[in-house]
Amino acid sequence: MPRFVDRVVIHTWAGSGGNGCASIHRSKFKPLGGPDGGNGGRGGSVVFVVDPHVHTLLDFHFRPHITAPSGKQGMGNNRDGAAGADLEVKVPDGTVVLDEDGRLLADLVGAGTRFQAAAGGRGGLGNAALASRTRKVPGFALLGEQGESRDLTLELKSVADVGLIGFPSAGKSSLVSVISAAKPKIADYPFTTLVPNLGVVSVGEHAFTVADVPGLIPGASAGRGLGLDFLRHIERCAVLVHVVDCTSVEPGRDPILDIAALEAELAAYTPTLQGDTTLGDFAERPRAVVLNKIDVPDARELAEFVCDNIAAERGWPVFSVSTVTRENLQSLIFGLWQMISAYHAARSEPAPGRSLIRPVPVDDSGFTVEPDGQGGFVVTGTRPERWIHQTNFDNAEAVGYLADRLARLGVEDELLRVGAQPGCTVSIGGMTFDWEPQKPAGHPVAMSGRGTDARLESTDPVGTAERKVARHQRHKHGG
């Protein structure tokens, strides 16, 4: 069973809104008190919340389907339905949210950072909210909207100050184990490290974090080996450290060539977070080189030979260390701390508690009418499609109200303009019907006054004598 998961695809469904209620107020001496149907409750949203106690996406690996509760239906006596509670989903610090096309939606960094992954549907209006001067007693209510449904990709990118990069078996895990309290798996075969390991390094009263990630090989930027699984974990690192094995006897391998090969892979990799100004350009992050395993005599000679060449060619600090004898480890720790401090001092500190969130633009102001190629037309637009989903097509009044709304929006005028003929098929939001125009093009829309009741129109007071006659008639018919 996997213990560390850093990339998952999840399916989120927000709760649907509750339906509105169509009811008439009735009480003693007031049998027709007007509409009093309440509105439906809003559906619950799916919200990601950063929890510092969560360190992996393992839970989503086994439970990728996330559904928020729906809102309740409205009731009579102007009682609104209860809203569905938002479903808060805990994610690790450093989680990146991508849409189906791989576009970055949110970069969640910092405890308590929130992101609404799927919005709950709006509740339908009750007939009390739909009443107007021309529609005094609506005999219908609106249906609740469906909650948003989205397929998202979550990627966990380690939040560390220093990222150790190097070929497999270069000694990265050993280095982390001796400069911090971390205990990664250490062995003498390639790809011993299959998941990132984080260690905290103390520097006097200060501390910084180091990420030990799987080994890198040529072609990693194209996905070879552990490839992209490795590279995304160094995107947030302030300092990148090349860990070079000075004991390697493989043909075509030496410290200078190893560094060049690793830099070629980094140059070919395009970070997801490259637009985040708080991190800076990935290619310009400060680098350092650690020449490891100098406790071996031949390795020490090689390190002394290439040290000045690397510093002169690259301009990076070079540290020759041994994790066995712990030689020069303190110099390495203080050198890395100075590089981290200089990096952060040169950059403006981001506001606390903020995250990179890129909302998807939504245009709900207009609509389009296009022929469907079979003599009919398709109307697309946020508002017309939403109105279709709010309509109960078993209720003639509700259908008439929909026709009024579409006419006010200009859908009917546009259909006439593009040549739609009475009786042709029109599709809106998955609903297809035969279109019949309500008015000539260009004429103002006359509201139909649907839902009126003549008994509510009278404003003349009823006299005592008339009430006595009415009561006598009721008693007479009653027996």
Swiss-Prot record:
Chain sites annotated for binding Mg(2+): 173, 193
Xref: Pfam families: DUF1967 (PF09269), GTP1_OBG (PF01018), MMR_HSR1 (PF01926)
Keywords associated with the record: Cytoplasm, GTP-binding, Hydrolase, Magnesium, Metal-binding, Nucleotide-binding
Positions of disulphide bridges: none
Cofactor requirements of the protein: Mg(2+)
Compartments in which it is found: Cytoplasm
SUPFAM superfamilies in the record: Obg GTP-binding protein C-terminal domain (SSF102741), Obg GTP-binding protein N-terminal domain (SSF82051), P-loop containing nucleoside triphosphate hydrolases (SSF52540)
Domain Obg: 2-159
Domain OBG-type G intervals: 160-341
Residue ranges of every copy of the OCT domain listed in the record: 359-437
Enzyme Commission code: 3.6.5.-
GO biological process, one term: ribosome biogenesis
PANTHER family for this protein: DEVELOPMENTALLY REGULATED GTP-BINDING PROTEIN-RELATED (PTHR11702), MITOCHONDRIAL RIBOSOME-ASSOCIATED GTPASE 2 (PTHR11702:SF31)
Matches recorded under NCBIfam families: Obg_CgtA (TIGR02729), Obg_CgtA_exten (TIGR03595), PRK12296.1 (NF008954), PRK12297.1 (NF008955), PRK12299.1 (NF008956)
Family per record: Belongs to the TRAFAC class OBG-HflX-like GTPase superfamily. OBG GTPase family.
Listed name of the protein: GTPase Obg
Species: Mycobacterium leprae (strain TN)
Organismal lineage: Bacteria, Bacillati, Actinomycetota, Actinomycetes, Mycobacteriales
